[in-house]
Amino acid sequence: MIDLCVLGTTGGMPMVDKYLSATLININGRKILIDCGEGTQVAMRKIGWGFKSVDLICITHSHGDHTIGLPGLISIMGNSGRTEKVTVVGPKGIKEIVNGLNVINPYLPYELEIIELENNDLKFIIDKNNMSLCEDNNKCNLILSSLEVEHSAKCLSYSFYIKRRPRFSVEKASKNNVPKPLWSKLQNQEIINYDNKIYTPDLVLDNARKGIKISYVTDTRPISAIPEFIKYSDLFICEGTYGSDEDIDKAIKNKHMTFRESATLALNGECKELILTHFSPALSEPESFVDNAKQVFHNSSVAYDGLIKTLKFID
């Protein structure tokens, strides 16, 4: 089960009633934060999910409304007792940005690893205590993909594929004459040399089961590569800076999207659900424009600060 919270929904500047656009994903107690503008720490405190268990921070781009909250968050994570490494990913140039912002935190009780991405994937293994990089495709249970999009600064979109472990098959293990003492290790994707014979996980596991895909796209024009990148997403979170179709010229000029454009991406990407966020400060009632999205992609909705969504694996 995966819980997701839209922490903030506005772009450009924090508002009295809206925090800056940011989203927190909770996978079995380990957390991924997407963007960290001014006030994100306060929004996180409101939902009560804690700071210590944030293992991965994904920054879409360097603009202040997506980064200025980082120094405070990095500090409070240390004050919360964090000692394990924290990974920050973002587009090329993010190392300089994060290191510059973080000059006020010279002494941290944990390692801060910063990785610059360019349309590539990272694999992670998530357990109850941490989320760490993993090279073994069989052992990893989270695949993070990135796509460079079109904005006034280098900007990345992200997709998160949470893998699901195959079911253990007693019938298959027995048929393949796998010794019972090896079953649990093989179920945990280990390869074992036992009595001069190699035993592999496929000897005891059924076929792979479908995981959950979450895609996050913000601060971009609707470029042609996005539908394939978000293909078959269970949840597509996308910017909708402008609700009205009449604001298309503003969207083009400022390299953002209208609700209708975002919905078209969801339709072409064959997504299950679209949640719109990152609204212009001038868009005081984004829900009044939701029909512009629904006319294109019916399962569209408008986010609000503190929205929590639960996604479950389907057998």
Swiss-Prot record:
InterPro entries: Metallo-B-lactamas (IPR001279), RibonucZ/Hydroxyglut_hydro (IPR036866), RNase_Z/BN (IPR013471)
Cited function: Zinc phosphodiesterase, which displays some tRNA 3'-processing endonuclease activity. Probably involved in tRNA maturation, by removing a 3'-trailer from precursor tRNA.
Catalytic activity annotation: Endonucleolytic cleavage of RNA, removing extra 3' nucleotides from tRNA precursor, generating 3' termini of tRNAs. A 3'-hydroxy group is left at the tRNA terminus and a 5'-phosphoryl group is left at the trailer molecule
Entry similarity comment: Belongs to the RNase Z family.
Cofactor(s) needed: Zn(2+)
EC number from the UniProt entry: 3.1.26.11
Protein name: Ribonuclease Z
Entry-linked NCBIfam families: PRK00055.1-3, RNase_Z
GO molecular function: 3'-tRNA processing endoribonuclease activity; zinc ion binding
Subunit structure, interactors included: Homodimer.
Chain sites annotated for binding Zn(2+) 1: H61, H63, H151, D219
Binding residues for Zn(2+) 2: D65, H66, D219, H278
UniProt entry keywords in alphabetical sequence: Endonuclease, Hydrolase, Metal-binding, Nuclease, tRNA processing, Zinc
